[in-house]
Swiss-Prot record:
<feature type="transmembrane region" description="Helical">
    <location>
        <begin position="88"/>
        <end position="107"/>
    </location>
</feature>
<keyword id="KW-0472">Membrane</keyword>
<protein>
    <recommendedName>
        <fullName>Putative membrane protein ORF51</fullName>
    </recommendedName>
</protein>
<feature type="transmembrane region" description="Helical">
    <location>
        <begin position="5"/>
        <end position="23"/>
    </location>
</feature>
<keyword id="KW-1133">Transmembrane helix</keyword>
<dbReference type="GO" id="GO:0016020">
    <property type="term" value="C:membrane"/>
</dbReference>
<feature type="transmembrane region" description="Helical">
    <location>
        <begin position="34"/>
        <end position="50"/>
    </location>
</feature>
<keyword id="KW-0812">Transmembrane</keyword>
Length: 154
């Protein structure tokens, strides 16, 4: 039962975070947002194809195929070993998250939705990056800006 709750929450969080990426790109078109949106789209399509095509992945691991952060850099493991394309997606997402941190710290531009859903999206798996991201915000953003973010529960 708990596995299904985690699965449903993961799918909802991933979907909402993707929607926020779309809105973020629509409201403020820039290269980082475009690359992030493109990578999200490619990884979602690839995950769906991989989930549908790989019969060697068990039911639990099918969920992991949908959520890179649940299994980290190793990704889904089938009979042939770890999926090499998964590592590419994982590393690309790691670079994009780092670019997001730079965007916030240098440009000091981040929507409350972006930060909130980054936190939600990372809560189930690789929360370390999200914690570093939020801790960096707390330490380096101007106090008034962080207070505005804190009002929204971040």
């Amino acid at each position: 039962m708990a596995q299904y709750i985690v699965t449903i929450f993961s799918i909802i969080a991933c979907t909402v975070y993707y929607a926020v990426s779309v809105v973020d790109f629509y409201l403020d078109p820039n290269l980082i947002a475009f690359i992030a949106l493109s990578t999200h789209t490619i990884s979602i399509i690839y995950s769906i194809i991989l989930t549908a095509a790989t019969s060697a992945i068990t039911g639990v691991r099918r969920v992991i195929v949908q959520r890179a952060t649940l299994n980290g850099a190793n990704g889904p493991v089938a009979m042939n070993g770890p999926d090499p394309f998964w590592k590419l997606i994982y590393i690309t997402n790691l670079i994009l998250n780092s670019a997001g941190i730079v965007r916030v710290l240098i440009l000091q531009r981040a929507s409350v939705l972006h930060i909130s859903f980054l936190y939600i999206n990372s809560a189930l798996g690789a929360g370390l990056l999200a914690r570093l991201y939020l801790s960096t915000l707390r330490c380096l953003l101007p106090h008034k800006t962080y207070l505005q973010l804190s009002i929204w529960g971040v």
